[in-house]
Design a protein with these regions (language model features):
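Pepsin/retropepsin-fold aspartyl endopeptidases
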Residues: 1-137
Length: 137
């Protein structure tokens, strides 16, 4: 497991972020969520963050800049995630699924992110349907 801490920009606001390969999902606190598109959940989800159980009643579409590169990913909204080793409040916990989605790798020994696998373009898949005009007649 690796962890890197740094600020990322959400709607121009810098947010203290913990990139953590030991966390599957991504989480944001309400102060960040107010800058995002959110939706309420029909039923709450429960997660364990930092050894504590948290309840999520809403989710957000996290659109942000990581070292100048745009990302967009799904995030759970939780009231609090605690503080890092330096006592700074964690506002975003960027999990392994989002890191994989955006080609973000951690270099813990240098305390930095590796964005060399960031997708510069997205390739769509074209589906071709062979329709037999005589079928179903």
């Amino acid at each position: 497991m690796g962890r890197i801490r740094q600020k990322i920009k959400v709607d121009g606001r810098e947010s203290w972020t913990l990139f953590d390969t030991g966390a599957r999902n991504t989480y944001v606190v309400p102060e960040v969520a107010v800058l995002l598109t959110t939706s309420k959940l029909k039923d709450p989800f429960r997660s364990a963050i930092g050894g504590e159980h948290k309840e999520t009643k809403a989710t957000a579409l996290l659109e942000a800049e990581v070292e100048g590169r745009r990302i967009s990913t799904h995030a759970m909204i939780v009231d609090e995630m605690g503080r890092d080793e330096e006592g700074k409040r964690i506002e975003i916990l960027f999990g392994a699924l989002a890191m994989q989605q955006w080609g973000i790798r951690l270099i813990p020994e240098e305390e930095r992110l590796d964005l060399s696998h960031y997708p510069e373009e997205f390739v769509g898949v074209k589906y071709i349907l062979d329709i037999d005009p005589s079928a179903g007649s």
